[in-house]
Amino acid sequence: MSKTHLTEQKFSDFALHPVVVQALEKKGFYNCTPIQALALPLTLAGRDVAGQAQTGTGKTMAFLTSTFHYLLSHPAAENRQVNQPRALIMAPTRELAVQIHSDAEPLAEATGIKLGLAYGGDGYDKQLKVLESGVDILIGTTGRLIDYTKQNHVNLGAIQVVVLDEADRMYDLGFIKDIRWLFRRMPAATERLNMLFSATLSYRVRELAFEQMNNAEYVEVEPEQKTGHRIKEELFYPSNEEKMRLLQTLIEEEWPDRAIIFANTKHRCEDIWGHLAADGHRVGLLTGDVAQKKRLRILDEFTRGDLDILVATDVAARGLHIPAVTHVFNYDLPDDCEDYVHRIGRTGRAGASGHSISLACEEYALNLPAIETYIGHSIPVSKYNPDALLSELPPPKRLSRPRTGNGPRRSGAPRNRRRTG
């Protein structure tokens, strides 16, 4: 994490449980990010927090630190049953739930607090086996949480801490009824610590906070700035016929260390993946059709640097902290203005600079005015020479083979091809 992204406030300055501070410092966390410095004084005082912060600002560690401190500082109910977790952390996607669980593991190891994970797709019996042994903090997606609760594998009657992460995304994915169902089975809001985090504190998110929290305090990090000032934005107007060649040319010119390419449909993502894999790039595909285990493996490979490019639908645009993404390509301009902000928010994180390149083609250029109105500025336009685009590119690979993840490794030697003109 860049030092420019940190405040002068140290975790050790707060009255945090000493074991929590030691665990944080062991992981190299000494100074707070802005959202942590704003949220911790409130949660340590037992006050509910609704925070506006993008992914990558340290919000996960803000609510994890608060949760572990609270559980260590407040005894569990004497009559608590083995199927009753003490804290519940709800996430909109299984990838985010897995990531939060991973971030919580060092704190759990240091404190002896037990973690559980519940998400759909696979691993039902494996997850259930952990729950049956008893967990203190349960992290999961709403569908699987409801499933376990209805079967009495989980009872929410002893919940002391609740976290709702990416609340706006919960609405986008239609999970709000599930959230309310789960809240109705918990103790009253006044009897627990409640935290909500969202990229935007829209009216509907504030309404949820009013309904389910106890006079929540609102904290915001740079609320006036919808796109990071460290992100260089750039816009091209390609024809539909030249769009793919322009993308491949830009990748050759930029040669990004780590890039994410977003498209609006899974079929478009598969097409992009096929062209880039055939062209020799180390590229992974992340859509809803990719099996859960493979999605997690691809994310891990991309995070480790074994893949240079990830092609994704908006399933990956929210909540996933992938460090050091240098470039984001919007192959399609998104239909939802907020998705533009969330997509380009993959880069320029934690004090680093980033580059966002958008292609406004004939099909999606109509989305541009609403996006620019939403972000409050025009995206700088760049021009390209059609005669300078790459040509003689290989035909795209197809997804007939099981391996969805990677194309061939990049070679340091240039391929024998030429630009036209």
From Swiss-Prot:
Ranges where the record places region Disordered: 390-421
GO cellular component: cytosol
Catalytic reaction list: ATP + H2O = ADP + phosphate + H(+)
EC number(s) from the headed UniProt entry: 3.6.4.13
Transmembrane stretches, start-end: none
Molecular-function GO terms, alphabetical: ATP binding; ATP hydrolysis activity; RNA binding; RNA helicase activity
InterPro entries (UniProt xref): DEAD/DEAH_box_helicase_dom, DEAD_box_RNA_helicase, Helicase_ATP-bd, Helicase_C-like, P-loop_NTPase, RNA-helicase_DEAD-box_CS, RNA_helicase_ATP-dep_RhlB, RNA_helicase_DEAD_Q_motif
Binding site for ATP: A53, Q54, T55, G56, T57, G58, K59, T60
Superkingdom field: Bacteria
Sequence ranges assigned to domain Helicase ATP-binding in this UniProt record: 40-219
One example of a Gene Ontology biological process annotation: RNA catabolic process
Residue span(s) of domain Helicase C-terminal: 245-390
Motif (DEAD box): 165-168
Places the protein is found: Cytoplasm
Sorted UniProt keywords: ATP-binding, Cytoplasm, Helicase, Hydrolase, Nucleotide-binding, RNA-binding
Biased composition (Low complexity): 405-414
Cross-referenced Pfam families: DEAD, Helicase_C
Keyword flag Hydrolase: yes
Motif window: Q motif: 9-37
Protein role: DEAD-box RNA helicase involved in RNA degradation. Has RNA-dependent ATPase activity and unwinds double-stranded RNA.
SUBUNIT field: Component of the RNA degradosome, which is a multiprotein complex involved in RNA processing and mRNA degradation.
Protein family (similarity comment): Belongs to the DEAD box helicase family. RhlB subfamily.
Name recorded for this polypeptide: ATP-dependent RNA helicase RhlB
Source species of the chain: Cronobacter sakazakii (strain ATCC BAA-894) (Enterobacter sakazakii)
